[in-house]
From Swiss-Prot:
General function of this protein: Forms part of the ribosomal stalk, playing a central role in the interaction of the ribosome with GTP-bound translation factors.
High-level lineage: Bacteria, Pseudomonadati, Pseudomonadota, Gammaproteobacteria, Enterobacterales
One GO molecular-function entry: large ribosomal subunit rRNA binding
Name of the protein this chain belongs to: Large ribosomal subunit protein uL10
Biological processes, Gene Ontology terms: translation
Length: 161
């Protein structure tokens, strides 16, 4: 489908707005992946509050100008699938890594978080970041263990005396 100038401007504006609201961005090469499989990925992304776009490189480059992801402009080459994490910085990375395990042809290219370009190892670290709820849960469990541990030690000291 041919895009006229107005449609291209709308796409650029839309992607720019999403980029300004997102916490991190990840790119992948979707070639050799069927549309049906990409649509399944989109459904999972929607559930996890991740915006996914397959967009022309020139439009993506123009929409990333004057955003915190502008470093990506010089790197973009070939077919691109872009994922924007909207709530948690590692959510798009986590989704792409899980998807990559099931689909070997899906190649994760780059990610940017806090104005830094991440390599594949850093992308995995970003994906392993706990979410807000996971962090709070771990903290509460830690507090319970600390208080229970003290209580048990007190009981042991009482029984020894």
């Amino acid at each position: 489908m041919a895009l006229n100038r107005n449609k291209k401007k709308k796409i650029i504006k839309k992607i720019n707005n999403v980029a300004n609201k997102s916490l991190s961005i990840i790119t992948a090469n979707p070639s050799k992946i069927t549309v049906n499989i990409i649509n399944k990925l989109r459904k999972k992304a929607k559930i996890n509050n991740i915006k996914i776009y397959v967009i022309r490189n020139t439009l993506l480059k123009k929409s990333l100008k004057k955003t915190i992801f502008s470093k990506l402009i010089n790197i973009i080459k070939g077919p691109i699938l872009v994922g924007f994490s909207m709530k948690h910085p590692g959510s798009a990375s986590r989704l792409f890594i899980k998807f990559n395990k099931k689909n070997i042809n899906f190649k994760i290219l780059n990610a940017i978080y806090e104005k830094k370009i991440l390599n594949i190892h850093e992308i995995k670290d970003l994906a392993n970041l706990p979410t807000h709820i996971e962090s709070i849960t771990k903290f509460v469990i830690l507090l319970k263990e600390i208080s229970l541990g003290k209580f048990i030690r007190v009981l042991q000291n009482i029984t020894k005396k």
